[in-house]
Structures are given as structure tokens and as C-alpha cells.
Amino acid sequence: MNPLIAQGESRTTSPVVVALDFADADGALAFASRLDPAECRLKVGKELFTSSGRHLVESLAARGFQVFLDMKFHDIPNTVAQACKAAAESGVWMVNVHASGGRRMMEAAREALAGYSQRPLLIAVTVLTSMEASDLAEVGIAATPQEHVLRLATLTRDCGLDGVVCSAQEAAMLKLALGRDFKLVTPGIRLADSAGDDQRRVMTPTAALAAGSDYLVIGRPITRAADPLAALRAINQDISVFLGKQS
């Protein structure tokens, strides 16, 4: 990992990961300048990374942000291992792979990151939040989303990864089955008054935390807000109040 990038990171206790759903680096960096790295992390997905590349990730990290590189690597073991190493070299905080790539692929990814003193969290994707039982059936999987999530998440844990991406509806089940140290990253987070958009299995921030989620990926409620930092702070305040009641 680039030591200059690592030194520039601002550690945050907020579980919020803001999804940078922008088409290019200019838009993403302009938006990031309106946020505080002490109050959130950022997610860079396939569209943005494909258009802007490693330089964007390094620029965000140099500004103090911890970056989740959401590329969902899914290929032969050696290719995924090398991709994960490249992600670590760019200074990311978290990177993910598809659990459906299987044991050898996930173990190769884990081993590729083992030598880094500041190793990124390695997370696996189970079932995409846009998918329902009918979608799984069309690709030959005779299981409910919950059943398939548990199967893939168990395999992920057995391969030594840090956690999974899952919907909040599966969080309680996974915490019970796989333990509290197994991290759950939850997309599909919406505020109570937000439209569901294209993610079917959605939940509010505090409900997701109550269910067992560790990190909350939030996009439109923050990126489309007139004042993104104010929206982020309102969410963090709600989370702080909720967590205070739990302690």
C-alpha cells in the first residue's frame, strides 16, 4: 500500500459509506469536496473506476477518505488475486469479490492480500440486492435469496474473508449463523421518505444497524441532497442517537 495515502486517511467511526455514483472523476471529486472524511467513507464502483481509474482512488485517499473499491471481481483465481493486489497498492480500505467465484478464487484473493501491513478488508458479494427468487430461478438456482445468501456467506467465512455484502433483511440471520466479527456491508439503504429505485431489498439506516449490519452504503439520499454534508450529518446523528439507546 502506498504509505503516503495511508498516512492521509482520516479514520471515521461512522458506518456510512457514500456511494459515488458519478460518471467521471470531475463529478466525483467535486462532490467529495463537499463531504468530510471524518464523517464517512466512500465507495467507487465499476462505472466510475472504469472511466477514471486508479488515479481517482489515490486522489480520494490522499484527501483523507477511506475508499471501498466495489468492483466485484469474478474470474479465475490468479486473475482475481492480482486484481486484489493492485487494489491494495492503490490504497483502498475495502475491496470485494463475487462469492460465486468459489473457494479457490476467494482463498487466492485472501492470500494475495496477506502480506500487506495495512491490508484492505476483503468482502464477498452474495446475492445482488436487485435480485429476487424469480431472478435466481432463471439462472438455475432453486433457492430463496435468503437461503443462497447463507450458503455463499458461510463459504466466504470458511475461506477466511472478512465479511459479505448482503441486504439488511439477511443481516440478523448472518450474524447469528456466522458470528459478530464477520462484517456485513449493506447496500439498499434508504431514508424513510426515499423511493426504492432499483434495489428491491431496502431498509433504513437505523433498522439496518439493529438487524446487524456493520457498514451502510448510501447513495442517492446523500448524493442528490441539496446539502450533502447536512444530509450525511443528519443520518449520522440519527445513528448516534440509536446507538446511544442500545448501549
Curated annotation (Swiss-Prot):
The catalytic activity, as recorded, is:
orotidine 5'-phosphate + H(+) = UMP + CO2
Q: In which pathway does it act?
A: Pyrimidine metabolism; UMP biosynthesis via de novo pathway; UMP from orotate: step 2/2
Q: Does the keyword Cell inner membrane apply?
A: no
* GO cellular component annotations of the record: cytosol
Q: What is its EC number?
A: 4.1.1.23
Q: What class of enzyme is it?
A: lyase
Q: What biological-process terms (Gene Ontology) are attached?
A: 'de novo' pyrimidine nucleobase biosynthetic process; 'de novo' UMP biosynthetic process
Which Gene Ontology MF annotations are present?
A: orotidine-5'-phosphate decarboxylase activity
Reading the lineage from the top rank, the first entry is: Bacteria
NCBIfam families the record matches? PRK00230.1, PRK13813.1, pyrF
| Subunit and interaction comment | Homodimer.
**According to its UniProt entry, what is the function of this protein?**
Catalyzes the decarboxylation of orotidine 5'-monophosphate (OMP) to uridine 5'-monophosphate (UMP).
Descriptive protein name = Orotidine 5'-phosphate decarboxylase
**In which organism is this protein found?**
Chromobacterium violaceum (strain ATCC 12472 / DSM 30191 / JCM 1249 / CCUG 213 / NBRC 12614 / NCIMB 9131 / NCTC 9757 / MK)
Q: Which gene encodes it?
A: pyrF
